[in-house]
Amino acid sequence: MKQVFNPYLPAGEYIPDGEPHVFGNRVYVYGSHDRFNAAIFCVNDYVCYSAPVDDLSAWRYEGVIYKKKQDPLNKLGIRLLFAPDVVQGVDGRYYLYYAYDFLGRMGVAVSDKPQGPYA
């Protein structure tokens, strides 16, 4: 039996519900961020990976794009942020939308670049 693995994330990196988007000449992947062996999911800050659209074997870690404690309702960092997605607005800026825990609320952060950082 062959081992199944993620083709672009390093071992130990867990980004479920990934959302790929093409902005310019790169593919960006956004998603929830799980921690290895954590009792719950979506506990890490958001990160981003990207690759050139013409070489999807050359993935690059863009870094932390949004820290969960940045959310005004999550200053202690105890709430889960999950299912993020990014869109480019008509103003050219990038908007990161995410679900705020299981409270029926959405959050939004803004950046001038698709790889963040978002505020």
Language model regions located:
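Carbohydrate-active catalytic/glycan-binding domains of CAZyme proteins
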Residues: 1-119
